[in-house]
Each structure stands twice: as C-alpha cells, then as structure tokens.
C-alpha cells in the first residue's frame, strides 16, 4: 500500500471548505395538538347539558364526557357520581382507574 500523500494546511482548509460533507438531516416538523381548553368549573348551563345529554348515551365514562362535553376529567368524575346517585346511569364496571356506566333502563 503506497503511503498517503501529505496535504499542506492550505490544501486541507480548501478541501474542508469545498463542502464535501452532507448537511445534517432536518427533522420534519410535526403538527402539534393544541392544548385543550376544557371547562373546570361547573356552571348551571353545563350542569343542565349533562343532565339532558348523558342519559341518552349508551356508553358513559369519564373520557366520553371529556370529549363530548368539553369538561375537565375531575368534573366529569363528579358528574358521573352524581348521575349514579340519582339513578340516571348504572355502573357496568368500576375500579380505581376507570368507571364505565350505561344509561339506566326504565323499569
């Protein structure tokens, strides 16, 4: 193997400036989901809407109320407990992480 040819400092600098290296890959910008602006205080209008709409849902959980009614999770949990106490909805499955309800059938 023949010895490498030694370049002068000027030649090395010129080679570096020639742009032989690839530029770094730019990561594509992803669309960011906007922060949800859900209600955190239960006013009379929201309460009336919960009492009117929730009994018509076949499947009721905290996430369903958050998505459809644009309320916070803690407010949705309080509303579900209230509706269960009133007998408007009945539990299907309840444990510490998730509570699933359905509408109470008229008997």
From Swiss-Prot:
Residues 8-20 have a biased composition (Low complexity). Pfam families: Ribosomal_S25. Keywords: Ribonucleoprotein, Ribosomal protein. Residues 1-35 are annotated as: Disordered. Residues 21-35 have a biased composition (Basic residues). GO terms for cellular component: ribonucleoprotein complex; ribosome. Belongs to the eukaryotic ribosomal protein eS25 family. This is Small ribosomal subunit protein eS25.
């Amino acid at each position: 193997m023949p010895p490498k040819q030694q370049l002068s400092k000027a030649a090395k600098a010129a080679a570096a400036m020639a742009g032989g290296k690839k530029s770094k890959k730019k990561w594509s910008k992803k669309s960011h989901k906007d922060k949800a602006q859900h209600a955190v205080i239960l006013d009379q209008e929201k309460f009336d809407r919960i009492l009117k709409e929730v009994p018509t849902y076949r499947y009721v959980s905290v996430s369903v109320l958050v998505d459809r009614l644009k309320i916070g999770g803690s407010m949705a949990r309080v509303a579900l407990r209230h509706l269960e106490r009133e007998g408007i909805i009945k539990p299907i499955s309840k444990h510490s992480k998730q509570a699933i309800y359905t509408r109470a059938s008229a008997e």
